[in-house]
Amino acid sequence: MTHITRLEAPWFLRASKKEYKWTVRASPGPHPLGKSIPLGLLLRDYLAFTSSLKESKKIISDGKVLVDGRVRRDYKYPVGLMDVIAIPHADLYLRIVPDRARLLKPVKISEEESKFKLVRLLNKTLVKGGLLQFNLEDGRNLLISKESTEMFKLPTLTTLKISIPNQEILGVYGFKENVYVMAVGGKNAGIIGQLKRIQTSPYKTRRYSIVVIRSPDGSEYETNLENAMVIGEEKPEVKVE
């Protein structure tokens, strides 16, 4: 199905329910329908880079828009958390980050920052040859050699800093006190601050532990560990506001 009614569309999309009956349905891809923005709508409704969907389709089909360093020609392609969008001919570079009001929003970044992204490790799988496969939140998979013993020990939900599109691991950020974290889901999505403590329970798995985030104004917020993402140690590694 190419389109859905605006009433059926994810609640956070910037789409007037009174202007048109139909809107774009995101294609199957690295992000689920309920956590992504179709690329064509991003250009028109979020960036005002185009004035119509037809214009968005033309620019995208001409190969002028890159997502995570690769040309995407599908105007329905789903972009989601921490994806990097580049429109080089317009000198425009963006990152998709959580938004307190609308779940997701684009923020402008520098060309230098567009060369890498942060992504969470969702799970690990042993594959043929004794290699370890990292399955990441944006749908990509990384093969880790047997010699990388420290990588084998990484817990799930660890944040990896990777180059794009080459997928070289540039940094690893785990959960510990005073690292910078961002709430990426739940009612506090978009909150950014330092991790003050993790409250665990013997009756729940690790991912349902409670993370306490202290924002710059001193307020404290709680969210599940699975709704939190480490974005840096001494400072955020990426621009998120």
Swiss-Prot record:
Q: Supply the InterPro entries for this chain.
A: Rib_uL2_dom2, Ribosomal_eS4, Ribosomal_eS4_central_region, Ribosomal_eS4_central_sf, Ribosomal_eS4_KOW, Ribosomal_eS4_N, S4_RNA-bd, S4_RNA-bd_sf
Q: Where is the S4 RNA-binding domain?
A: 37-99
The signal peptide annotation in the UniProt record is: none
* GO MF annotations, alphabetized: rRNA binding; structural constituent of ribosome
* Protein's name in the database: Small ribosomal subunit protein eS4
Cite the Gene3D superfamilies for this sequence.
2.30.30.30, 2.40.50.740, RNA-binding S4 domain
One GO biological process term: translation
Keyword rRNA-binding listed? The answer is yes
Task: List, alphabetically, the SMART domains matched.
Answer: S4
Question: Mind telling me which NCBIfam families this protein's record contains?
Answer: PRK04313.1
User: Pfam families, alphabetically?
Assistant: Ribosomal_S4e (PF00900), RS4NT (PF08071), S4 (PF01479)
Q: Which SUPFAM superfamilies match?
A: Alpha-L RNA-binding motif (SSF55174)
Cellular component aspect of the GO annotation: cytosolic small ribosomal subunit
Q: Which organism is it from?
A: Metallosphaera sedula (strain ATCC 51363 / DSM 5348 / JCM 9185 / NBRC 15509 / TH2)
Keywords attached to this Swiss-Prot or TrEMBL record, sorted alphabetically, are: Ribonucleoprotein, Ribosomal protein, RNA-binding, rRNA-binding
Annotated family: Belongs to the eukaryotic ribosomal protein eS4 family.
